């Protein structure tokens, strides 16, 4: 069962490594079956920051700090609770130093087979380092080892809309099934006898090929669903009901949901079934058309439906995606993926070298293309407009369209170009993003947008940038990086891709074209902004180089101090005194005891204090001492680790607007209030 929601504790566990460990250079992470001292079993995702070896199938007695899967909650982005539930993950854990081997790994299990395949590719990569990225792509396409691809490659796939091609999904499994079915059909032509029911053998061969590939890829939940879907389609065709694509589609959907009800939580399920439905819808009554016409029509159907699905789910549309996918899908499906499988089943150096060569130059071409490929931010549309957009997309796919296709185009354009209503003059909307154990604050006026810090690279990619898009931020007027620390500027590259007119930093030497955030004042749309600097008596540590921003709208103020410590706070008090007074204070250093001194809280005298920290973080931020100091001053403490992103409206009577995302499903834990 799932790890209890409120329990975060150090435990002695017996763990068995269930899958290949992934090393991202910072930690080794792997899935494990774990048993506590009472014998209760859990499926955990464990992280080892000491980056030790963990053989697949080995069993260990370990000390670990285990917590439930609680992630960031923003208006858009990755929802870790949904991901964990859909993938059967009960909890997360960080391994301590103590471990004792209980049983060696090895054997002939599925995980061991995948580990052997990975090592064979790695040996070739070690021998030919000039093809290391190509080897990484082959490992990703054959056994689903996504960590083999460098982060810059993942960043290149996103603006091209190609992430689905390097994450083994329904597309890969389907193409392998088609390839196996085609091979069996070709083999039958050369047999002296033909089975009485060749269709059965062809369909069975396709499903068997899909199952083999899914097993090689680790038999993850998405690949399991893909095999189930294909098996259901094959069954429908064998029983004779495949003449109607819709009959097979409904039967496949029913089978998947009956065997795996949690499939409804997976974005991949909706994308897979949605795109297949679009293809069936677009080809209805046109099966006599030539192959290339059907292919073009299928690409058109997938593109139209993707406008709504990708715009809503990811708040972004890769503009070159239709063209790039039209070329990349056949290349990946019929060349690179078969070569990846061939090099895995027959791990000869020549086979793997040819595959790596083609993959390497494919990646180099995509990296170049990604530099010139734009993305279009799609703001979160109201539910009525979303429903109308989906109906418009389906209408465009109809053969005739009932004469309403021009109206459908207008609705889709309205969905894509929708923007939230502008703020009033003299009002600032402040969104303290849920950046985990990091910081990112968006400040919006009527016509301007300023972002203070970006959070970590992962949070920026999976939460901050999608949320900026969803809130209608197409470009930043200013980006402030308080200081050079991974939890404050780690997502700089990802956020910079959104575009910014001005970059300010406490340590500008670490960023291109950055200016030092010296003392300054300016006004946007009737809202005053002020950059503050502590007196010369402040500390010289990196944290004390943090930019300090104060925003005032209609007499209501916000103060952000980055990671400024007590020395820096004392320097601010010495220089500005009671001019620091603000209704909202973002606590320094995530609520660490090294900041938020009693004298500073007394001087600022905020109504609200916000701690931006990660749930159950190892530093125990906000610390008990800081919480006690805040409450002793009569200040309301708000926490992103418990509430998710928080919204304030400076310049209005009700400053605190509540959580950014107010609704949640009954099974979700966060927001906790």
Task: List the predicted regions and their residue ranges.
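Membrane-interface helix/helix-cap signal primarily in integral membrane proteins
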Residues: 1-164, 462-466, 475, 508, ...
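Transmembrane helix-bundle segments that form internal channels/tunnels in multi-pass membrane proteins
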Residues: 1-14, 100, 184-197, 201, ...
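Aromatic-rich juxtamembrane segments at the membrane interface
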Residues: 86-227, 529, 557-562, 566, ...
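Cap/insert and terminal regions of metallo-dependent hydrolase folds
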Residues: 569-645
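Di-metal (Zn2+ and/or Mg2+/Mn2+) metal-binding site signature of metallo-dependent hydrolases
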Residues: 162-185, 474-497, 561, 585-599
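Membrane-interface helix caps and helix-loop-helix hairpins in membrane proteins
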Residues: 214-223, 238-242, 258-267, 311-319
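Active-site HxH/HxHxD metal-binding segment of metal-dependent hydrolases
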Residues: 486-519
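Core dinuclear metal-dependent hydrolase active-site scaffold
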Residues: 146, 235-238, 258, 262-264, ...
